[in-house]
Each structure stands twice: as C-alpha cells, then as structure tokens.
Design a protein with these regions (language model features):
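Membrane-active amphipathic alpha-helices enriched in small hydrophobic residues
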Residues: 1-7
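Catalytic toxin/effector domains delivered as secreted proteins or via bacterial secretion systems
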Residues: 9-20, 26-169
Length: 169
C-alpha cells in the first residue's frame, strides 16, 4: 500500500510539473536519457562527475548553467561519499552551488522556514562530505537574487562556503 501511495504521489507530481513547466520536464527527461558524462578532465582527485539531480524551472536550469559553465545534467560528487552530496559544478578550483531565480520568494516568507532549514542542512552536508573525503576545496554559493543571498547570510554559514550575488544573464 505504501509503494502504491508513493507511485500515485510521483504521478501527481509529474502531472503538476508537466502542466506548469512542460519545457523543464522535457529537458530533464532528455538529459536523463542522454547522460554519458561530459568527458571533463579538470576535476581533482577525490571528485567525480555524475548525473545531475536538479532540473528545476527553465530559468533555474539556465542560471545553473551560467554559474557552472556545464549543462545541468552534470553534477559533481565526492568519491566514496555514500550520502551522495551533490554540487552543481566545479570551476577554477572551486565547487559551485547555484540558487536560481525565485529562491527569494521561497525563503523570505514565514512558510519558508523549512526551505531555510534545508539550505542550512545542505551547507553542512557539503562541508561534511569534503571533510570525510579529506578534501580542502572552497565552495561558492551563487544567488540569482541579492535578497536571497542576504537571507542565507544570516544562517550559520560554514567558513568553507562563500556566498555571492551573481545576477542572471
């Protein structure tokens, strides 16, 4: 019964996404089918490229690609990290995380408390994954909205993470 409920929830979620962002759903499906890796060779020992999990709205995908310089179907992971902590990209010796448009809307309201808690947890998990992997690599979080970055700066941001406002192109 639980698996049936999960399947129904997944179908409802997919139908909702298809109604509200059909291009995003199609892009995610195509990316999942095509994934073969980018063939990049710039990753330091201890990091690897894997299938990306974050395929939000078209604007969020475009912002992630702007920040990372790679298609959203690619993400970066720490070798040996069973928790599979994801980073959106790696460039110039820095791990990257992109917080796209509409993040401010989500985290600026009273009901955004859970989203802020998830953001704090994500920061902590990223830093912990690097520590477990014995890696000393800086992490840069880029925000498409200055207000979202300012709210995130009030969290307990670990020293390994630096926040930036980078406007979408």
């Amino acid at each position: 019964a639980a698996s049936l409920k999960g399947a129904v929830h997944s179908l409802r979620s997919a139908a909702h996404n298809l109604r509200h962002d059909p291009q995003g759903v199609l892009a995610s499906a195509v990316a999942a089918l095509k994934f073969k890796g980018s063939g990049r060779t710039d990753l330091p020992k201890g990091l690897y490229e894997g299938r990306g999990k974050n395929h939000g709205s078209a604007a969020a995908r475009a912002y992630e690609e702007q920040i990372t310089g790679y298609p959203v179907e690619y993400s970066i992971y720490v070798e040996g990290d069973l928790a599979k902590v994801e980073f959106d990209g790696f460039r110039d010796g820095v791990l990257l995380d992109a917080k796209g448009p509409r993040t401010y809307v989500i985290i600026s309201h009273d009901w955004g408390t859970k989203a802020l808690e998830k953001m704090q947890t994500q920061m902590d998990r990223q830093v912990d994954a690097l520590a477990r992997g014995g890696l000393d690599i800086p992490i840069h979080w880029h925000f498409a909205e200055k207000g979202a970055m300012e709210i995130a700066a009030k969290l307990n941001v670990p020293p390994a993470i630096t926040l930036f406002y980078t406007s979408p192109k």
